[in-house]
Amino acid sequence: MGDVNIWMIVGFLLAAYSVVANDSLQTLGTYISSNKTRTPKVVQMGFICSVTVIVLMLGFFLNDGDPAWGRLEKFELPEPFGWVYVIPPIAVLALTQWGAPVSTSFLVLSSFKAANIGKLLGSSLSGYFLAFALGLAGYGLGMWLLERWVFRRTQEGKDFNRVWYGLQWVSTGFLWSMWLVQDLANIFVFLPRKLDVFPMAICTAVLCVGLCFLVASGGGPIQAVLRSKTNTSDLRSATVIDFFFGLCLFYKAFLSTFPLSTTWVFLGLLGGREIALRIKEQEFEYTFTNRESGNLGKIIGSDLWKAFIGVVVSLVIALGIQPLLSCLLYTSPSPRDRQKS
C-alpha cells in the first residue's frame, strides 16, 4: 500500500457518503420503499451490510488487494494528490440534495483522467440503450400483465403471497452485488490501488456505517425518481425491476472491466418500462399506470434533464480540475526548492 495523505482520506469519506447517497438509492431504492413498513430496519441493515462485506472481500482477495474489481486500471492515482480532487464528491452531494440522478462515474472518475471521458460516455450510453431495450421489450411483451395485475390488486387493497418476500430479497442481493462490482471504483479511486488487510477492514466498516445511515433515513431526494414511476413501491414490481437492473449490470460487468454509469442504466430501464406500460395501457378502457406525476413526456423528460445537468457539471469539473491542479503546482514550490530555501 502506498502513502496516504489527508486529502485521500477526506476524498474517500466524502465519496463513500455521496456515492452511497446517490447511486445506491437507485439500486436499493425499490428495496427500501417496499420494505419500509414490513421489515425492521435492523434486519435490512444486516442484510445489505452482509452482501457488501462479501463482495468487498471477494474483490480484495481475488484481485490481489484491489477492492475495485480491477476497474481502476486506466485511472492512475494522481501525484501529487491535492485538495482539488475532493471537489467531485462535494458536487455529487449538492446534486443529490437537488434530487438529480447524477452519474458519479462521470463526476468522480473523469476528474482523475479527463482523457477517459469519451470512453466513459460510450460505455454508459451502451448501458442506457441496453437497459432501455430490455425494459421496453420485457414489459411490452409480457411483464405488463404483472404490472396491471399488481395495480388492480393494490387498488382493491388485496394482500400478496409471502413468496414475494423471499424473491425480492434474492433479487436485491443479486442487484446490490452487481452494483458494488461496478461502482466501488467511484469510491476507492481516492486510495492506493492495492490495500493491506487492516486499511481494507476500516474502509469496509466505513461503507457499512454509511449504508446503515441510508436505511435509517429511509431514502432521500433521489427516491422521487422512483415514486414517479408505476408500482415502484410495490414489493412485487420492485422485485422484477431489481432483477432486470441486476441482469444489465451483470452483462456489462463481465463484458468489460471498464466502468460505466449505473445511473444511466437505471434511467434507461425505468424509461423503457414506463413507455411500454403506457403503450399497453392504451389498449384498455382503464388505467393501470401512475398518472399522479404527469404525462409520460414530463416524467421521462424530467429524469433525462436532471441527468443531463449532472453530465454538464461533471464535464465542467473534470475539465477544470487539471488546469487548476497545474496552476497550483506551478505556483507552489517543489520539495527541492523548499530545501534550498
Ranges and model annotations:
Residues M1-L329:
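Alpha-helical transmembrane segments and immediately membrane-proximal extracytoplasmic
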Residues Y330-D337:
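Conserved small/polar residues in nucleotide/adenosyl-binding loops
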